[in-house]
Each structure stands twice: as structure tokens, then as C-alpha cells.
Regions:
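N-terminal and secondary-structure boundary signal
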Residues: 1-239
């Protein structure tokens, strides 16, 4: 009941953003398709008018091949869900509400930005630049590939932390579900080792869920700059 009150889905267009950056059968790089399917079914049960899954990898150019390799294509076909390659989706220009970078506007995937309910479904992983990659970092992927190129270098040049804050300030996730069934530790987000974390976490507060996951992973979230700054600008609760 609390979930229904906080994130009403009935009659809404839902955009689900997993983390599908690369595939390696020996490493837990991508969001488990089972977790994505669980979110799809939850949204269907709640009466979503439309469900779209979208991703735009900054590492692999061929999303079709990547979807097949990681097993998500099968889930999408079986559930009759449309997929949007964010790297090629139409662009939506929006005033940058974060203003941490020097960018006056943020260019988003039109489908992601205009969705009624934006759901971030990341993997529980370490990251060599940001310490962790969770719900907040996952929304880096809804920035337009057509506007920023591949792999969205302009956002990197502005500073990853600044860009994460700006993106989330301008279009925050309405709901986050972190796949921590098998997480990644060490040299993430691509080359770390698997760890059986055995957790799934869901929240309508992207800062709180990232802070909780960070503590679970052994980090102090107050020492992770993008989480601390997102809390400071009012995007969620760090405590």
C-alpha cells in the first residue's frame, strides 16, 4: 500500500532504465534480466498504461547484440515490451536545474525524460571513478547519445560528479530498484569480481538507496562526492 501511494503507476507511461553497459558471462556487469522482468511484471500488475525499457551503453555500440547476450532480449519479447536505444532516441533539451557543470541545458532521451514514471534499475557495483555505481550514476545513461556523442564524452569533460548531480537534479528517478543478488567488488564497473550480496533494495529516494547500498558495500556515503552533493541539493536523504 505504501508503494502504491508513493509511486502511483496505474495509467502511467513507465520508463525502466537498467544498467546494460557490457556483457561477460564471468562477471556481474549488467542488471540481471530476472530483476528487470520482476519490475516489468510489478508495473503491469499495478496497471501501467505503457512500459518501455531503455538503455544506451557507453561501452558497446550494438545494443541489439548486447541485449541478446545478456538475456534481456528474451524477457522483452516474452513480455511484449518495447526497447529504446537511448544513444539513438530523439533528444529533449531541458534547462539544467543542477548547474554544477557549465552546461546551460541537459539533452535527454525524449522517451526517458517525458515518461510519467522513471525507474532506475542498476547493478550493485563498485566504480573506479565514483567509488560506486548505483541509482544516481545509472541515470547518466538517460543523457542523449545523439547530443553528447559516444561515450557521452562532453559529460565526462564537465566532470562526472557534476554531470551526475545535474542530470538527477533535472530528471530524478521516481523509483529505484538495485540488483544486488550478485554484486561486483574491486575493479568495477567492468572488471571487478562477483560477490554474492543477496540483496534487492527498492526506494523512491535515490540518495537514500545509494547511501544504504554504499554502507552495505563498506563505504561511507558522506565520502562519496556525488551522493553527498545530491543530498546537499535536496534530491534525497543521506542519513
Amino acid at each position: 500500500q505504501t508503494f502504491k501511494q508513493k509511486v502511483p503507476i496505474a495509467g502511467k507511461k513507465v520508463f525502466i532504465k537498467p544498467n546494460i553497459v557490457e556483457f561477460n558471462s564471468n562477471r556481474p556487469i549488467h542488471t540481471n534480466p530476472v530483476v528487470v522482468e520482476s519490475m516489468i511484471r510489478l508495473c503491469l500488475e499495478e496497471g501501467a498504461a505503457e512500459i518501455v525499457v531503455g538503455e544506451g551503453s557507453g561501452h558497446r555500440r550494438n545494443m541489439g547484440c548486447l541485449l541478446r547476450e545478456c538475456g534481456l532480449e528474451k524477457v522483452l519479447i516474452e513480455n511484449k515490451i518495447r526497447f529504446v536505444d537511448i544513444n539513438y532516441d530523439q533528444t529533449k533539451r531541458v534547462v539544467n536545474l543542477g548547474a554544477k557543470s557549465k552546461l546551460g541545458f541537459i539533452y535527454f532521451s525524449k522517451e526517458a525524460y517525458e515518461s510519467d514514471v522513471l525507474i532506475s534499475v542498476p547493478k550493485l557495483k563498485t566504480h573506479h571513478w565514483t567509488n560506486v555505481t548505483l541509482s544516481l550514476k545509472n541515470l547518466f545513461g538517460i543523457a542523449s547519445g545523439q547530443a553528447y556523442g559516444w561515450p557521452k564524452n562532453e559529460l565526462h569533460f564537465q566532470g562526472i560528479v557534476n554531470s551526475i548531480v545535474d542530470i538527477n537534479s533535472t530528471r530524478k528517478a521516481d523509483l529505484s530498484l538495485v540488483d544486488g543478488i550478485v554484486g561486483m567488488q574491486g575493479d568495477g564497473p567492468l572488471y571487478g569480481e562477483p560477490i554474492n550480496a543477496n540483496v534487492l533494495l527498492m526506494s523512491d529516494d535515490p540518495v537514500a538507496i545509494d547511501a544504504t547500498c554504499s554502507r552495505f558495500m563498506g563505504f561511507d556515503p558522506a565520502g562519496i562526492e556525488h551522493i553527498r552533493l545530491c543530498s546537499k541539493v535536496g534530491l534525497g536523504n543521506l542519513a
